[in-house]
Regions:
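Start-transfer (signal-anchor) and selected internal transmembrane alpha helices
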Residues: 1-32, 217-221, 306-323
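Membrane-interface micro-motifs in multi-pass membrane enzymes
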Residues: 75-80, 99-109, 136-160, 186-190, ...
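Signature aromatic-anchored transmembrane alpha helix within multi-pass, membrane-resident enzymes
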Residues: 219-223, 325, 375, 381-409
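Extracytoplasmic
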Residues: 402-546
Length: 546
């Protein structure tokens, strides 16, 4: 009975954290409308839906409907390839046009709590102390802040990698590293980089030992599965277009104690929110409870009062310092921020910023250090004479401090309580227009003109198995961009494909030659197809009307 109580209490923790973070109405696969609100999680849902609707044979990782005719990898629509691979064999049995992002959020909190408990359990004197420690490692603002990017909510991968690293026997086993690296490669490239930081720390430790040096080199084989998966994504192909935005999304020098969003803390002062990159991508805030434990750890270490057992284990974490320092340099970027303001700015060569474009949201790269420091602080507290009191008090402080953040983030999922599928394109004539078209083309072919309309129309296209000529991607192949630009030039010149539905985003006027053909439904302008398209060809079940 006692043995069963541990996983049960961990599952309860994960479920409670989910309910504090999200509304339960995000869970049903048939509730889709909340994802089509012009946010990045709509991109994730659309890529996955397109893959289940028309993706190649399992275990292919591409979908052909978005950015057609080339299509794109699930990785580049942030659509959680792992989820696609798990669901694809059942695609003929699943309802067309379902969403699984809500269930993914729940899975992430459950797995996060499980790995947090595994990390803390053997250091805690009793079950209550272990639960409080696991709760502290789960109530991480960096996790809750990623509500808009579902794939990046898999921060349990960092805890899994830390769990492997912290036990020397596991850290020497390439099989464990191959598993976590392979799964990370099936979730998100940033998370793969972060897991590599832990792997490189374990490798460095073994290389420093003469006895382990020869066998350590064999550990490089752990990279093979992840490398093959990334090759399957097309990550080594391209070339890909650069956004020239490295440095726009940094982590600040004071990010651990300054959330840069006054709405996210009840107890500590915060600088103004500022730019999205500073307050969103760069958020590394510990929360008051964890910050108190970090300060306590620093004090006990400096004064020699840290117990011998955790001190010896935590000393191994220093092998992670080289990779963490490198990540910190990239995360802080060329214009270090303090209290929301740059201290100075360095001019980087264009070649360097383009090379760093794959990690342009660099502020995220501080997560491994954030989690590792939090873990060290929790372990040190768990090993003290007053462990339960310390961890319980820190947990209470953490909950009080980040309660405003949880409320603000949970409010972002309020649209899930509205059963409507479409709000911007509610007229059912849109379904007929999309179904009759051979393809959908958005003009201008840019994501942030009216992303909500783009997502709603694209969702109809995916359900109807109709290709979409342009769609928002995290990385865009130069060949695809050249074809999209050619589409736009033809449209600007008044040359239309008669089987294509043209949706005009924003308020840019249509080309003079086409002005007379523009129609409006729900305030959205479009040019309908003048010739019906052939029947769609999709691998999964027949289309159903949304």
């Amino acid at each position: 009975m006692r043995r069963a109580a541990v996983p049960l209490s961990t599952a309860v923790l994960g479920a409670l954290v989910f309910l504090a973070w999200m509304r339960p109405s995000v869970l049903p696969p048939g509730n889709v409308g909340w994802l089509l609100a012009g946010e990045d999680r709509g991109q994730s849902a659309l890529g996955l839906a397109a893959y289940l609707r028309a993706g190649g044979p399992w275990p292919a990782l591409r979908q052909p409907l978005l950015a057609a005719p080339e299509g794109m990898a699930l990785l580049f629509t942030d659509s959680i390839p792992l989820l696609g691979l798990l669901l694809k064999p059942f695609a003929p049995l699943l309802p067309v046009g379902g969403q699984y992002i809500g269930l993914w959020y729940l899975a992430c909190t459950l797995l996060h709590a499980a790995f947090a408990a595994a990390l803390v359990r053997r250091h805690a004197p009793d079950a209550l102390a272990a639960w409080c420690g696991a709760a502290l490692l789960t109530l991480m603002p960096a996790l809750f802040n990623r509500y808009g990017h579902a794939s990046l909510c898999a921060q349990w991968l960092l805890l899994w990698a830390l769990w492997i690293f912290i036990e020397p026997r596991r850290a020497r086993d390439p099989g464990w590293w191959a598993a976590v690296l392979g799964v990370a490669a099936l979730v998100h490239s940033y998370l793969l980089l972060m897991v590599l930081a832990f792997w490189s720390g374990a490798l460095l430790e073994r290389l420093a030992s003469r006895r382990e040096r020869g066998r350590a080199l064999l550990g490089v084989a752990a990279l093979v599965p992840a490398a093959l998966i990334m090759a399957a994504h097309g990550a080594f192909g391209g070339p890909y277009a650069a956004t020239h935005t490295y440095g726009a999304f940094p982590a600040a020098l004071d990010a651990w104690w300054n959330p840069a969003n006054p709405d996210f803390t009840a107890l500590l002062p915060s600088s103004p929110m500022g730019t999205e990159g500073r307050g969103f991508e760069g958020l590394q805030y510990f929360g008051a409870g964890l910050l108190a434990l970090v300060l306590l750890l620093a004090f006990r270490t400096a004064t020699g009062r840290l117990e011998a057992e955790p001190r010896a284990e935590l000393r191994r974490l220093l092998w992670l310092a080289p990779s963490f320092l490198l990540f910190a340099l990239v995360a802080i970027g060329p214009a270090p921020l303090w209290r929301g303001e740059p201290l100075f700015a360095l001019h980087l060569p264009a070649r360097l910023t383009d090379a760093l474009d794959p990690v342009r949201a660099a502020g995220r790269l501080l997560w491994p250090a954030t989690y590792t420091i939090a873990f060290a602080a929790v372990v040190a507290a768990a090993s003290s004479a007053r462990a339960t009191l310390l961890l319980g008090g820190a947990l209470a402080l953490q909950v009080v401090d980040i309660a405003p953040m949880l409320a603000a983030v949970r409010h972002q999922s309020r649209r899930a309580d509205d059963p409507r599928l479409f709000t911007r394109t509610a007229d059912p004539r849109w379904t007929e227009l999309v179904t009759r078209a051979g393809a959908v083309q958005f003009e201008p072919a840019r994501p942030f003109v009216d992303l909500a309309v783009m997502e709603e129309v694209a969702w109809r296209a995916v359900v109807a198995c109709r290709p979409v000529r342009y769609f928002y991607a995290s990385r865009e192949a130069l060949a695809t961009r050249a074809r999209i630009d050619a589409d736009s030039r033809a449209f600007a010149a008044g040359r239309l494909d008669p089987a294509r539905l043209y949706v005009l985003l924003g308020d840019r006027p249509a080309p003079p030659a086409l002005a007379g053909r523009v129609r409006v439904i729900n305030g959205v302008r479009f040019i309908p197809p003048s010739r019906p398209a052939p029947p769609p060809r999709c691998a999964s079940s027949p289309p159903t009307a949304p």
